[in-house]
Each structure stands twice: as structure tokens, then as C-alpha cells.
Amino acid sequence: LLVVNQRLKGTFIFMPSLDSTQDRFAGSEHKGVRRGVRDWTELMLKDHGFLRLYWHNLHRIDEMMWRSNQPSPSRVKQAAKRGIKTIINLRGSRDDGGWQLEAEACVTYGVTLVDFTARSRAAPTKEMVYGARDLFATVTGPSLMHCKSGADRAGLMSALYLLIHKQMPVAVAREQLAFKYGHVKQAKTGLLDAFFDAYEPFEANGMAFFDWLDNVYDPDILQNSFMSRGWANRLVDDILRRE
């Protein structure tokens, strides 16, 4: 279905391939029906897609980048009609119905799908941040970033996009991690806020972000020093069922 075009640090970029799509479905129509039912069941029930039928958490970051929660195939179609050329999936490639349907929709509507793995409950690694920098420098055309709910990983990457690619102040970038997007900083997901908080005083003293990342930042220290709150973790993990 998809052909690997390029690999960045932790990133796989897939381009539409008509020939491989034909090969996948050739002579297996009955199997395709069963697979399609399974994929839609996983997307709607296991992945809580029914909650996203009318709630898309869709927001424009700037003229070239949008953020949202996990799109359905119909939303991929709508994005393509709006001029979106690249969809960045922050959940990484997965062997489940949601990923399969998204990948197939991207092939159908001529959208490039990028799989990039970001974490919502861990201090960002230096490798991930550099991978994000390379990704932002590589993608072409209007793009859409998404995770499952569009709250935490989408917020992290949106903030990095503004900080790294658009060279905005950390105070502006950090606004992408906000409750209005569904982000709860009192939970373990607050590690993402702590990451930007840790850089802010060094920015005030004139230190460039990547100088701080290379010479000062220690993800283990940040991880071990962060204290989340039990009620917030129960909300995010048990009630909202975030990844």
C-alpha cells in the first residue's frame, strides 16, 4: 500500500503508490471486506473514534500547519480538499485499524503520510527534538499534525514547531499546551510543560534553544523531578483514556 520514501530520526515518510495498492487488494475482495469491518470496528470502538465524530480538536497554528485529533478517512478527504499536502501522525505506525484506514485514505486522496513517534508522559529526548527539527524542515505544503486526542503530543509538537521552525519565544510556543486543547498539566503529561519551563530562564539569558538542549538539558533529571497529581492522572489515564 505504501512505499517508504525517506527516513528521519524516528520518522518514516510514506508516499502514495498506486501499484502497491492494486497488489494489496488483487484477488482478495472477500478478505478486504472482513479487514475493512475489523479496521472500522477498531477505529470506532477500541480507539474511541465515536467520540471524534463531531469533536475534531482542529486548530490552525499558522498558515502552513494545523493540529487535530485522530482523523477518520472522511476527515482526510476534507483536509485534502482544504489543501493539506502532508499529514503527520504523531502516534507512530501501528498495526491497527485506525492507522490502516488513515494510510489508505492518504493514498486515495493524494496526501503524504508521515509517521513520527512522540511521547505524552515522558520527558522529550534529545533525539526526538532533533527529529522534529528535521521533520519540520523537510515537509512541504500545508500540513496537519495529529495524535489520538490532539491534546498532548500534538501540543508538544506544535510548541516545538513554533519554537524551532518559526523561532517564536518559548512563552508563545508553550501556549500550544493548554487546557482548551484538552491538555492537563497537573497529570504526567505536565512533563511536556516542564520541558519548556526548564528552558525559559536560559532563553531569557540569551542561550539558543539547541545550545541549551545539547549542553544543559537532562531528560532523566526532568523526569525524576516532576511530580504529577493523582486526581489528574486518574482523569487523563482512566477517564479520558489518553495514550
Language model: regions and residue ranges:
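Active-site adenylate/phosphate-handling loop in enzymes that bind or generate adenylated species
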Residues: 153
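Cys-dependent protein tyrosine phosphatase-like superfamily
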Residues: 4-143, 156-243
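Substrate/cofactor-recognition hotspot
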Residues: 150
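Short cysteine clusters
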Residues: 147
